[in-house]
Amino acid sequence: MLINKILISIIAVLLPLLVAAQSVSVVRENKQQKFHKQMPAGNYSGVAYLGNNRYAVVDDKSEDDGYYIFNITIDTITGKILTVSDEGFVKTSNGNTDLEGIAYNASQDSVYTIGERNTGIESLTYNEQTHRFWTTTEAPMPEDGMPATPENGLTNRMRLKCYDDNMTLAGEYLYEMDKPTAKSSGRNYVFGVSELCALDDGSVLVLEREFRVARTGIGTWCKCKLYIVNPKTTAVDNVLKKSLLWESKTRLNILSRSLANYEGMCIGPRLSDGRRLLLLIADSQYRHKGVMKDWLKTLVITDR
């Protein structure tokens, strides 16, 4: 009887933790869509939801720093994108600093951008409930080792950093990527974290991206994996525990031109059933050679 009581007590303690760990999940994946007549060709690298169907989007190769405003309407039942319209470009400064991330603070009605040049920063996200900005580099910092490639057998170890509303460092956490799945680097190979997305409960979505360009072009592919981590359950000096929510592999070959290099990601509006929309946007390198496309994709997630 004593053993049974102990087991029941352990289960009672663990069950809320298990439920909490499983509270975020992807419940619907919509097909990627393109709106080339409504959107200018771009190197879209970050997106932030402004409310009222409006999204701020940065282009890391735009002539000047700033962001586009796209109005994107969503089917409130399925989460599928219905329409896209371009409301113009908001210039913030002269010249280009390779903007990679963008976030929006609704309480201050302020848009924040971050550039990769000289820093390697790849992402930026902000959450109103936690009052935290999150960012990371695309590849490991020098002190954390060499970047992983298909040839060297290494694993990327990243540092996810969070800042409060005053831009004071509030935490730093180690994150370990999966090992590369490509057998060789091909003509070009990019492997790293392309975006983060902060959620209301303090957890963070991490988008891992592996992009292999074949030597002839045909056979190029891009694999994206969406993980969730919760810094609250991991000591600062330990590697974050992660759970896979979704993965996708797009290709460029004779039969398929679905190749999508997703670099931007943000939480959008709630749907009619209370679930949340997650919007992803791809970097097409200005629709490179007519085969790359400015893909948009939506996932529907539960967050409570």
Regions inferred by a protein language model and the residue ranges of each:
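Bacterial Sec-dependent N-terminal signal peptides
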Residues: M1-S23
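Sequence/structural signature of beta-propeller domains
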Residues: Q22-R304
